[in-house]
């Protein structure tokens, strides 16, 4: 049976494709390719195309004949997105022939030797299938048949069926091995980890919708901004909210997904800082991650401000553990001095508060105090062996000059990540979160237990020398200052089992107790005695005091133990000139703890104390909460945005699934309206047509029925419908303004007059058509203009009953203008107020296998890029230009193709 060239059946198409492929292969074998390299290259390209066509038709035949008996290819889910192309089958066939001929994949000699027997089996099985299909084409072909009509009782048909099954199984096995050798393929464990990350993304999105960080409308419209917001919020949620999820940094590094494994150490440091944030600070950070707007706190808050700490090793709903000791964090203090030194006299009155020192850097916040003299702080740094004289306010202000932690803006392009994206082998330096001192202190605390005992003994000795152990009450009874208050953390402590946490001296839990904590505030003395109040502050990282009862002390003595490793000066001390009387005392009273503790529990408390001091050291480094939130934003956004480059295909697939899961269910379609009423109302735009932009409140007209219709241009308004207009013609022949036929309630301030009329001044923009003549029957101009009602008043007459809802546009008394000048001015105003156009639809990646400019095929190294102006798909070279697109509301430069760049910019 002859097979015609115009036959469209599967067997006929296979027959002609196979003949063309055989002809190209025969021509390649007829000459020496090294002698004619150009001809050889051209024929090899034709050979690859012929193989693609033959295998594509063979796959269609196997789909029809084998059906559900085809070999499973679920492993393709582990392949990178760039590998799954139409030409994959042809590449596999070409690779199998090369391996069967003795060639090897470059730098993959071992894998090539392993695959060579399978490659030979694949090529042999494929040759057998081609021969059987050619025979079937000549015996059982039905011209232009849409389906295969083979004789099931024929032995050749049964042989073809079994041969196709064998080839399909061998080809699937070879596909998995060959692709795994050529590119990095996910393991089963990694695939499951990424599924868990997808679940984390979905949980994060649902939480963001619940707390109001995002809106359901953004999800339904597939807002591109969510591509960045969801991964950023997921990092925060995975570190401090869903702590047992895929971002659990306490598990071994091998159990963390490859997406976040390079940032493991950075994520650990970010987690520790996130757990010190209050709920308000965490909300501000998440809002910043969504909007990139500047942080606006209600007041200038100190670093440790707040009674609630986010995180702490357990869920926020967990109950506190009353069996633990109480933990008091002294946030900021303010000390006053009544000094009668002859050399001082009367000096400017200041109140020094929140005095933090880190590596000889100070941040001083001064507040006026009407009753007190200058505060004095004589701070000593025994580690570095230098004294700082702070009696002179000039020295204090001079030392208060501190460089900003990060001078760049909040946007990622302005930030140099430098040490941000470091691997596990290179620890971060103090330019971001941790400092070398903290790392040394952490390693020292984890390695030397004897050092802890020495620290505690030194602290107890200092407290004894300073008179902290005395039970003499303070004689001051002045009201406490607002800037000085204790904060009790409510998080239990548990030792971390992670080796990395031990190296960095990090403990994942906090102390927690139901006990009360009291702090005696400094109070001015209005007596003839000369008293000097000295306030000692901790100079290294944090103000931290913990209630510990000394075994050698009396049962009634209440004191505070501060870690000497952090050089914590106690908040209770005496002045040399005060005769030993304590001028400031901080005490902590436990609710039910014993006064004595065993040596084992003391060692554990000491280790926990040092670890907590190390944890809070990173936060004290930042002088304000805004600096801390800014730094966390830079780090979190840097990690999340880096995923857009390293795992672009995986991230797109995850976010696509998240959008599908969390999008609103489709609303039931309304019955079609009658044709007569179809022209009365402007057509509501399809949500699918709105890619990025939504109408603002000023651009939405709300009818009495509650429906919202977005007006994007003047063409959507029917200004000539007399039945739909409630406005009369204003003086001067202006055209009637279109409005809803139903009565409308306008939420503005109205002033009523004696005759019952109401004058309403509004500031909205109404689109109307310009009149071409003086009479109502005159022809109207096609040009449209916008009338600003801020220059007019709407007078509603409520006295008459026959003209319900009638309103007139009355121009205010102003300088008379001609109609032409008014039209030109209003036309310019319309251009100003015009809504941005809807951006073009993006062509799906699957519909563009080649660049739409240079026709180059996309590969794992030549990626797709969309032009924001035309929506086309281009390679990086053809879409390297950038230009702002004001017509779409894009005021910043975005990616455009070369043709659109020339058209928009004109160069």
From Swiss-Prot:
<dbReference type="InterPro" id="IPR017455">
    <property type="entry name" value="Znf_FYVE-rel"/>
</dbReference>
<comment type="similarity">
    <text>Belongs to the lst-2 family.</text>
</comment>
<feature type="compositionally biased region" description="Polar residues">
    <location>
        <begin position="742"/>
        <end position="751"/>
    </location>
</feature>
<feature type="compositionally biased region" description="Acidic residues">
    <location>
        <begin position="501"/>
        <end position="516"/>
    </location>
</feature>
<feature type="binding site">
    <location>
        <position position="851"/>
    </location>
    <ligand>
        <name>Zn(2+) 1</name>
    </ligand>
</feature>
<keyword id="KW-0862">Zinc</keyword>
<feature type="binding site">
    <location>
        <position position="875"/>
    </location>
    <ligand>
        <name>Zn(2+) 1</name>
    </ligand>
</feature>
<keyword id="KW-0479">Metal-binding</keyword>
<feature type="binding site">
    <location>
        <position position="867"/>
    </location>
    <ligand>
        <name>Zn(2+) 2</name>
    </ligand>
</feature>
<dbReference type="GO" id="GO:0031901">
    <property type="term" value="C:early endosome membrane"/>
</dbReference>
<comment type="function">
    <text>Negative regulator of epidermal growth factor receptor (EGFR) signaling.</text>
</comment>
<dbReference type="InterPro" id="IPR051118">
    <property type="entry name" value="LST-2"/>
</dbReference>
<protein>
    <recommendedName>
        <fullName>Lateral signaling target protein 2 homolog</fullName>
    </recommendedName>
</protein>
<dbReference type="Pfam" id="PF01363">
    <property type="entry name" value="FYVE"/>
</dbReference>
<feature type="region of interest" description="Disordered">
    <location>
        <begin position="716"/>
        <end position="756"/>
    </location>
</feature>
<dbReference type="InterPro" id="IPR043269">
    <property type="entry name" value="FYVE_LST2"/>
</dbReference>
<feature type="compositionally biased region" description="Polar residues">
    <location>
        <begin position="351"/>
        <end position="361"/>
    </location>
</feature>
<feature type="zinc finger region" description="FYVE-type">
    <location>
        <begin position="845"/>
        <end position="905"/>
    </location>
</feature>
<keyword id="KW-0863">Zinc-finger</keyword>
<feature type="compositionally biased region" description="Polar residues">
    <location>
        <begin position="816"/>
        <end position="826"/>
    </location>
</feature>
<feature type="region of interest" description="Disordered">
    <location>
        <begin position="770"/>
        <end position="834"/>
    </location>
</feature>
<feature type="binding site">
    <location>
        <position position="900"/>
    </location>
    <ligand>
        <name>Zn(2+) 2</name>
    </ligand>
</feature>
<dbReference type="InterPro" id="IPR011011">
    <property type="entry name" value="Znf_FYVE_PHD"/>
</dbReference>
<feature type="binding site">
    <location>
        <position position="870"/>
    </location>
    <ligand>
        <name>Zn(2+) 2</name>
    </ligand>
</feature>
<feature type="region of interest" description="Disordered">
    <location>
        <begin position="662"/>
        <end position="688"/>
    </location>
</feature>
<feature type="compositionally biased region" description="Polar residues">
    <location>
        <begin position="486"/>
        <end position="495"/>
    </location>
</feature>
<feature type="binding site">
    <location>
        <position position="854"/>
    </location>
    <ligand>
        <name>Zn(2+) 1</name>
    </ligand>
</feature>
<dbReference type="InterPro" id="IPR013083">
    <property type="entry name" value="Znf_RING/FYVE/PHD"/>
</dbReference>
<feature type="compositionally biased region" description="Basic residues">
    <location>
        <begin position="525"/>
        <end position="549"/>
    </location>
</feature>
<feature type="region of interest" description="Disordered">
    <location>
        <begin position="339"/>
        <end position="395"/>
    </location>
</feature>
<feature type="binding site">
    <location>
        <position position="897"/>
    </location>
    <ligand>
        <name>Zn(2+) 2</name>
    </ligand>
</feature>
<dbReference type="InterPro" id="IPR000306">
    <property type="entry name" value="Znf_FYVE"/>
</dbReference>
<feature type="compositionally biased region" description="Polar residues">
    <location>
        <begin position="568"/>
        <end position="580"/>
    </location>
</feature>
<feature type="compositionally biased region" description="Low complexity">
    <location>
        <begin position="550"/>
        <end position="565"/>
    </location>
</feature>
<feature type="compositionally biased region" description="Gly residues">
    <location>
        <begin position="592"/>
        <end position="602"/>
    </location>
</feature>
<feature type="binding site">
    <location>
        <position position="878"/>
    </location>
    <ligand>
        <name>Zn(2+) 1</name>
    </ligand>
</feature>
<feature type="region of interest" description="Disordered">
    <location>
        <begin position="463"/>
        <end position="604"/>
    </location>
</feature>
<feature type="compositionally biased region" description="Polar residues">
    <location>
        <begin position="463"/>
        <end position="475"/>
    </location>
</feature>
<dbReference type="GO" id="GO:0008270">
    <property type="term" value="F:zinc ion binding"/>
</dbReference>
<feature type="compositionally biased region" description="Low complexity">
    <location>
        <begin position="777"/>
        <end position="793"/>
    </location>
</feature>
<feature type="compositionally biased region" description="Acidic residues">
    <location>
        <begin position="367"/>
        <end position="393"/>
    </location>
</feature>
């Amino acid at each position: 049976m002859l097979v015609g060239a115009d036959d469209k059946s599967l067997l006929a198409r296979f027959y002609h494709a196979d003949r063309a492929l055989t002809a190209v292969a025969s021509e390649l074998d007829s000459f020496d390719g090294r002698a004619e390299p150009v001809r050889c290259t051209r024929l090899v390209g034709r050979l690859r195309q012929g193989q693609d066509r033959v295998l594509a038709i063979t796959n269609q035949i196997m789909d029809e004949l084998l059906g559900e008996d085809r070999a499973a290819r679920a492993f393709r889910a582990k392949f990178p997105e760039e590998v799954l192309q139409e030409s994959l089958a042809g590449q596999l066939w070409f690779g199998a022939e090369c391996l069967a001929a003795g060639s090897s994949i470059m730098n993959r000699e071992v894998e090539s030797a392993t695959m060579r027997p399978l490659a030979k089996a694949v090529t042999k099985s494929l040759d057998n299938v081609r021969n059987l299909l050619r025979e079937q084409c000549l015996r059982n072909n039905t011209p232009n048949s849409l389906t295969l009509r083979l004789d099931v009782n024929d032995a050749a048909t049964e042989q073809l069926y079994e041969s196709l099954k064998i080839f399909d199984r061998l080809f699937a096995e070879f596909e998995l091995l060959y692709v795994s050798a050529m590119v990095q393929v996910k393991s089963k464990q990694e695939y499951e980890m990424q599924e868990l990350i997808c679940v984390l993304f979905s949980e994060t999105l649902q939480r963001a919708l619940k707390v109001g960080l995002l809106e359901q409308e953004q999800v339904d419209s597939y807002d591109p901004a969510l591509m960045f917001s969801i991964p950023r919020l997921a990092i925060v949620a995975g570190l401090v909210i869903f702590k047992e999820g895929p971002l659990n940094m306490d598990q071994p590094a091998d159990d963390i997904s490859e997406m976040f494994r390079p940032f493991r150490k950075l994520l650990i440091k970010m987690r520790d800082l996130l757990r010190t944030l209050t709920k308000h600070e965490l909300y501000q950070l998440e809002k910043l991650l969504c909007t990139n707007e500047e942080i606006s706190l209600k007041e200038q808050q100190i670093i440790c401000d707040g009674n609630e700490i986010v995180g702490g090793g357990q869920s926020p709903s967990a109950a506190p553990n009353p069996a633990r000791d109480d933990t008091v964090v002294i946030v900021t203090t303010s000390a006053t001095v009544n000094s009668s030194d002859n050399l001082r006299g009367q000096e400017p009155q200041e109140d020094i508060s929140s005095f933090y020192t880190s590596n000889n850097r100070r941040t001083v916040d001064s507040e006026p105090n009407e009753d007190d003299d200058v505060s004095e702080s004589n701070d000593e740094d025994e580690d570095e062996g230098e004294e700082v004289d702070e009696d002179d306010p000039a020295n204090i202000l001079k030392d208060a000059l501190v460089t900003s932690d990060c001078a760049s803006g909040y946007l990622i392009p302005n930030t140099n990540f430098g040490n941000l994206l470091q691997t596990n082998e290179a620890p971060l330096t103090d330019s971001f979160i941790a400092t070398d001192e903290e790392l040394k202190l952490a390693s020292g605390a984890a390695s030397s237990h004897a050092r802890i005992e020495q620290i505690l003994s030194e602290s107890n000795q200092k407290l004894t020398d300073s008179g902290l152990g005395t039970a003499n009450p303070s004689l001051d009874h002045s009201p406490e200052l607002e800037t000085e208050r204790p904060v009790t953390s409510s998080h239990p402590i548990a030792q971390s089992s992670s080796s990395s946490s031990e190296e960095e001296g990090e403990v994942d839990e906090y102390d927690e107790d139901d006990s009360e904590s009291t702090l005696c505030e400094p109070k001015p003395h209005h007596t003839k005695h000369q008293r000097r109040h000295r306030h000692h502050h901790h100079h290294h990282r944090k103000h931290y005091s913990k209630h510990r009862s000394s075994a050698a002390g009396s049962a009634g003595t209440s004191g505070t133990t501060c870690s000497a490793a952090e050089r914590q000066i106690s908040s209770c001390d005496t002045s040399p000139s005060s005769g030993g009387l304590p001028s400031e005392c901080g005490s902590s009273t436990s609710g039910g703890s014993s006064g004595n503790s065993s040596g084992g529990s003391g060692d554990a408390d000491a280790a926990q104390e040092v670890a907590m001091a190390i944890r809070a050291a990173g936060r004290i480094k930042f002088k304000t909460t805004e600096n801390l939130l800014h730094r966390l934003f830079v780090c979190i956004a840097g990690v999340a945005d880096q995923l857009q480059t390293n795992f672009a295909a995986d991230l797109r697939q995850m976010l696509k699934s998240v959008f599908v899961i969390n999008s609103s269910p489709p609303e039931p379609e309304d019955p079609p309206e009658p044709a007569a009423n179809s022209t009365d109302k402007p057509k509501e735009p399809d949500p699918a047509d709105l890619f990025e932009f939504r109408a603002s409140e000023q651009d939405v007209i709300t009818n009495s029925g509650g429906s919202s219709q977005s007006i994007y241009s003047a063409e959507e308004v029917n200004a000539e419908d007399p039945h739909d207009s409630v406005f009369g013609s204003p003086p001067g022949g202006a055209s009637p303004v279109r409005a809803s036929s139903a009565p409308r309630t306008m939420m503005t301030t109205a002033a009523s007059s004696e005759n019952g009329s109401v004058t309403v001044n509004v500031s909205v923009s109404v689109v109307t058509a310009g009149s071409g003549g003086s009479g109502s029957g005159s022809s109207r101009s096609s040009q449209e203009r916008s009338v600003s009602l801020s220059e007019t008043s709407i007078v509603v007459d409520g006295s008459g009953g026959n003209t319900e809802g009638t309103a007139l546009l009355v121009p205010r008394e102003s300088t008379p203008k001609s109609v032409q000048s008014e039209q030109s001015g209003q036309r310019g105003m319309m251009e100003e107020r015009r809504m941005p156009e809807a951006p073009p639809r993006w062509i799906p990646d699957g519909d563009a296998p080649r660049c739409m400019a240079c026709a180059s095929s996309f590969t794992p190294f030549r990626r797709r890029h969309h032009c924001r102006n035309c929506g086309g798909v281009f390679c990086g070279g053809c879409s390297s230009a950038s230009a702002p697109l004001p017509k779409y509301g894009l005021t910043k430069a975005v990616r455009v193709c070369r043709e659109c760049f020339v058209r928009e910019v004109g160069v």
